[in-house]
Amino acid sequence: MATPAAVNPSEMGTDLPGPVSMPGAVVGAGQVRMTGAMPGRGGKRRSAGMDFDDEDGEGPSKFSRYDDDQIPGDKERYARENHSEIERRRRNKMTQYITELSDMVPTCSALARKPDKLTILRMAVSHMKSMRGTGNTSTDGAYKPSFLTEQELKHLILEAADGFLFVVAAETGRVIYVSDSVTPVLNHPQSEWFGSTLFEQVHPDDVDKLREQLSTSENSMTGRILDLKTGTVKKEGQQSSMRMCMGSRRSFICRMRCGSAPLDHISLNRLSSMRKRYRNGLGPSKEGEAQYSVVHCTGYIKAWPPAGMTIPDEDTEAGQTSKYCLVAIGRLQVTSSPVSMDMNGLSVPTEFLSRHNSDGIITFVDPRCINVIGYQPQDLLGKDILEFCHPEDQSHLRESFQQVVKLKGQVLSVMYRFRMKNREWMLIRTSSFTFQNPYSDEIEYIICTNTNVKQLQQQQQAELEVHQRDGLTAYDLSQVPVSGVSAGVHESGKTIDKTESLFSQERDPRFSDIYTGISTSEKKMMVPSSTSGGQQLYSQGSPFQPGHSGKSFSSSVIHVPGVNDIQSTAGSAGQNLSQISRQINTGQVSWSGNRPPFSGQQIPAQSNKAQSSPFGIGSSHSYQADPSSYSPLSSPATSSPSGNAYSNLANRNTAFDVSGESSQSGGQFQGRPSEVWSQWQSQHHSQQAGDPHPHTQASQTEVFQDMLPMPGDPTQGTTNYNIEDFADLGMFPPFSE
């Protein structure tokens, strides 16, 4: 039984693929020791072959016909060959599928060399996750906040994206949908996009690029492709499977035409829309030509029509039966043009950049220098900037370069005269700072921004004229009545005419009626005052005389809701302020006379009426910048010699502010300001010198109702209005819109 096995070792060796190590040591009769892994013979080998056959879909029946008519060696050889063939076919199929998968995944096809199989599988999984979004969003709307409607969510998304949503047919480019946010972005009404194609809205030179992005055919993807996400050039080949895949990403940049819809200066924040247009545009266009903005479009290819939606009959008859559509968001792309673009659209550059070494030698110049100073960049390279500076300004410029080196990164500005190419002198403002090596902390070079001062001022003036002509800076004053500022010295020393508006812009003709009404109303509210410049408001060392006239009030405080102004006559306001400033500079007390105490006779008579918020009364005797000077009760320097001048009010826990300027905030005065002051002065006009405190009349009670808080009034509480409450108030309160 063991003889055939011992006789055929060579035959068995020839049947085995590859070299077989046979030491030849006989272990037993008919047995030979063989190194290496060798499968057993007989039923084991046949069962292994049958397992591989089952893997290929073939049953063990093909071996049944060899059981009787072939020897066992031939059957084993066929089984080994069949197994190798099956493995080869399986490997070929796997390689084919992985190659297709690699072509479908953009990150794989963008690699320089072919990745291995594990890398392809890993990138495919990542790509599928990115196509699904974050992985936790669902189509049932569970990701949407419950307190937001669909319309509100759409507006929030478009506002955050700062763009507009549009849907176009992939084959024809017909606009299926566009959001209303296209108006603030491209200044196009929504109706202009409906019924048109996207090819009509883009620049003629970008039509082919757009058609390539919308196409899903195989012919459009031959050649090299630039991947915008990775910044690499893909290899040549067909990408039809990716182009036809649902949800395939599209990202491209094109130029879209800007419309001419009227600007809504209320909703578009006035100047921001114009600045955005020029920042994202391609420069000024010629007269009659369309203006284009650079738009970055990102989106996906989707099936069209969606499930459950049918195409209208008119679209079917027109042949617009596209199977795909592009759903994308268009955002304005900031252009990288080095030319500075101002609001008028017709300006030339006013500044250029230059780089210098520590000695002032020019190592780099911005090409904008051609339009600013007339030199070519090569004319300036390698030269000292002092060569172009005026001889009288060279020392000043040299010191500024030495100083900026010591500042180490801080900006230093200097103005000097620069010689242009036409031998003329130009006033240049240079803002410079140093760049330091982050490792060695040494100064590498100096960066300078050089600006033509005169040309910049001219362009700013032209910009302002453009704004006023377009109506972008016209304030709507129909809801805010504003009174004019009386003649006087402003903060910067500039005299402001009484008829001049609070705003620096010129008046718009549309609001002439409003300004006329304001002028009429302020004339009615103004209290005449004829205080001469040489007359002293309060004599030093003399008690306060109650029988004073209107001359004692150099200015009347009139409060308009939202605006507080100080009004006085044109003839005496400047003189009064100059006299006050002289008194302050000499260190004298503004009102050092004996203040008569206010008796409480007239206060209890008013306790049965509701009181309004208090406000300070008196004349404009204290205009000091120090907040402590706004009340004579706040510091010993401004108090009267008699310490108990206001003892009655102090005991009642009610402070009486006698400064005329410390209570001009909007919350301090409610009611009729013109009537209050006219009644207040009429009472003083009717007083006699012998009666320091006349009896309270009906009109007097109405006046004090708006002036003094009553002690014990539940509406006032225990609030004590001291100077700390008005410490943050300036002499000229800011205007709040």
UniProtKB/Swiss-Prot annotation:
Efficient DNA binding requires dimerization with another bHLH protein. Heterodimer with the aryl hydrocarbon receptor (AHR), SIM1 or HIF2A/EPAS-1. GO terms for molecular function: DNA-binding transcription factor activity; DNA-binding transcription factor activity, RNA polymerase II-specific; protein heterodimerization activity; RNA polymerase II cis-regulatory region sequence-specific DNA binding. It comes from Danio rerio (Zebrafish). Residues 627-642, 659-688 have a biased composition (Low complexity). NCBIfam families: sensory_box. This is Aryl hydrocarbon receptor nuclear translocator 2. The lineage of its organism: Eukaryota, Metazoa, Chordata, Craniata, Vertebrata. CDD domains: bHLH-PAS_ARNT, PAS. Pfam families: HLH, PAS, PAS_11. Residues 528-543, 588-626, 643-656 have a biased composition (Polar residues). Its main location: nucleus.
